[in-house]
Amino acid sequence: MEEKKTIIWAGFDVGKETFSASLDKITESGKAKITSLPCRDFKRNPEGVTKFFQWADGFVSEKELHIVMETTGCYSQQLTDWLNLSHPEVKVSIENARNIHAFIDSLNLPHKTDKLDAQAIARFGTERQPHPTKRPSKTILTIRELSRERTALIKARVELQNRRDTITSSVVRKINAQTIATLTIQIKKIEKEIKACIVENEEILAEVHIMTTMPGVSFVSAYNILAEIGSLKQYSAKELSAISGLAPRIRQSGSSVHSSFMSRRSSGRLRQILYLDSVAGVPKIPVLQDFQQRLLAKGKKKMMVRCACMRKMLLMLRSMVIHNRAFDENFLKFSQTSFDL
């Protein structure tokens, strides 16, 4: 029988310029004290990644290395790219910052430093054994960055437009108009880049095309959904409900049973998109209309019903993409078993 390799967990505390790395493993004598774990700082660049692996080689030897870090937006994503490029065989887990912070709080550490955080994150990996993170494709990451920049520019333009009627100075009014015009040009340029990215990728193009056949889901909504969570094909129905933050969270303690609420453990942008799509789409989709009326008849609150429809709508999109078929308002009536809702 093949002997199972010992896994060494590397905990990364990632910053803008540097990252702190610590190594941990379970030995025959048990777990070492957290503050005694080896730790070192490296530059957050390709050279720093190379130096990390050179340093870690002295501890890893024949053992398997698994890296875990908390999500820090572009910093953790860029560092993961360098890690994969340097050592593609090494597994990397990017964990929800809330989970890691809760774990660190439970350790009751005396101080808060980058070194201690890296050591605690390494212990998090040893104890929790997180699964490797599914890395989005380069195209999805590019679309995500472009779509978020587009949203930021639109928000800035709306603020300027709302202020336009209150401006009394002719000079300021002229600057306001010029800035709005510049933002409009930049927004159109970003939209053109997004379309080019989608057209170049046949798989993403096909998925967007199928999603836009559902009432309420526009081209912008479709690519924003993909930008936030990637292809819908990669998730089960339960995983998709959880990653969207729309799964209900139950609160019960002893004889006290509190009302459930939305978990919200994911992208707020995704829920915003689904909310707007459901407002436009539910009245045009008989299945969701019936579902909405049944919940309202049971006395459910309107916002709770809206969230349930958002979740149902997302799962319908997933089923359409998996089965590669356009929206059909009657498809649930003759294909109940094919769609995992």
Feature locations, PLM:
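Long, charge-rich intrinsically disordered scaffolds of nucleic-acid metabolism proteins
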Residues: 85, 93-210, 214
